[in-house]
Amino acid sequence: VNTLASSVRVLLALIVCSSLSGCYVMQAALGQLDVSARREPIAELLSSPSTPDPLRRRLEYVAEAREFATRELSLPDNGSYTTYADVGRPYVVWNVFATPEFSVEPRRWCFPIAGCVVYRGYFNERAATRYALRRRMRGDDATVGGVAAYSTLGHFEDPVLNTMLGWNDAQLAGTLFHELAHQLVYVAGDSEFNEAFATVVEEAGLERWLKFKGLEKDLESWRLQRRRNVEFIQLLLATRERLKALYASGASPAEMRARKHEEFGRLKFEYTQLKARWGGYAGYDAWFNRALGNAHLVSAATYHGCVPGIRAILEQEGGDLPRFYARMKALANESKEARRSRLCT
């Protein structure tokens, strides 16, 4: 692990930060430095007799999935996910999403390297909650969500985190594939394209991984959950489209506020119908058991709005991942508008 190089990058970020109001970059740089400092080589942990057996089994699984990602999925072969870090908390980062009261378009924030993104990430939950409160006081819809993993796009050697190990095997492997995909193709300022590409790689990779492992039961469970998730996302995107039309209708603020409330009530009702069709599956109950606003729809649009278009390109290439990656890299060189018109709903 090149700790010196990582520290130099962080120190440069701190210098940049000294001129920024609120020092948001400071907390991000210090948070990343803390994660980097906690890294331990997985190979050493696996050879150490003091490593607890449950952790050892999870890390053995990660090591095998990581090797598969390079060999079978043509994903980057580097130091990412060859180390482990315990950050001592349930999430590594908390993201704040915000929208104007009468808009489904997310607020965007621009940073070095990542470009403009639809969230602000905080390594401290209270800081994220405070920022979301400030956005609400300015009239925005805002929500905070915990994040168990993220990608530094290859600028650091991303570790496997303790926050990831509570997932089932399929989710853990899928996240590795997703985050490594960000290192392969990433367009600064186009979160929708980036996340949809990584999601398609995650899906394709996980299908192949579970078949490789001979886990037919896990594969069927994952396919069922994916179908449910598609229906859940379609529900959110349909609500988003109705709200988008409402906000463009020219109605008075009072009328829009009332109809907005009705739309989120309709969303919750439609979820109860969907849940009944699922035979009572309650996996999304926690998502709905809160007051909802525009900001809660941001992730659905960001992560899934372009997925069908990108998935179609993978199918056009017969599932050949290197050819698919080449198509994606070519699209990455086009304008954002051209990509969106071709790929996104």
Task: State where each predicted segment sits.
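Bacterial N-terminal signal peptides that target proteins for export
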Residues: 1-11
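Bacterial Sec-type N-terminal signal peptides, specifically the leucine/valine-rich hydrophobic h-region
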Residues: 17-20
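Post-signal peptide N-terminal segment of mature Sec-exported envelope proteins
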Residues: 28-55
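Solvent-exposed, acidic/flexible segments
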Residues: 35, 48, 55-62, 121-128, ...
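Sec-exported extracytoplasmic/periplasmic mature domains
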Residues: 47-51, 60, 64-74, 181-185, ...
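Acidic/His-rich structured neighborhood in mature extracellular/periplasmic domains
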Residues: 65-229
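Pan-zinc metallopeptidase signature
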Residues: 233-345
